Amino acid sequence: MLEIQDLHVKFHNRDREAVSGVSLTIQDGEILGLVGESGSGKSVTAMSVAGLLPRKQCDYTGRILLDGQELLHADRSVLREIQGAEIGVVFQEPQSCMDPLMKIGPQVEETLRIHTQMPKEERHQRALAAMAAAELPDPEGICDKYPHELSGGMLQRAMIAAAIVNRPKLLLLDEPTTALDVTIQ
């Protein structure tokens, strides 16, 4: 499903590479964890796979293939089709990733609105199911709340729901339990 071949990423404002020679393969249904010290390139590798790094600020070499489709040098329009539909991402800082002016429900539903022709009520029901799967209490009530009205752990769960709502092939998790309570982690 996912193949990374000799990935190198260097930011223009840094002396050394953020990622140096990463190669890995992930098959359907497989779970792989990247472990390393802070600054070792785990997040940059994940962001490269998701197509979320600013291309004008870094140089890439190598290949990233999702079901044989090249992602590293793909057009932004191709990446937009893949992001959310085939790749879901959960970041460690949900406060910086959620739109503070948009209620939680529409944010969880957003990938369905963009990538499917699903009717609004069906999108809403799918979002509620994803929120329940992420162990959000009272998903219906949380849909009408803004990000600032939720705790860090609740917001992290909402972000997990948004990442899984469209049932992506690949789920990238960058320290997804950082904001969760110890009992949930």
What are these model-predicted stretches?
Residues 145-150, 154:
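Conserved ABC ATPase signature
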Residues 58-70:
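Conserved ABC transporter NBD signature motif
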Residues 108, 160, 184:
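Hydrophobic anchor residue at the start of the ABC signature
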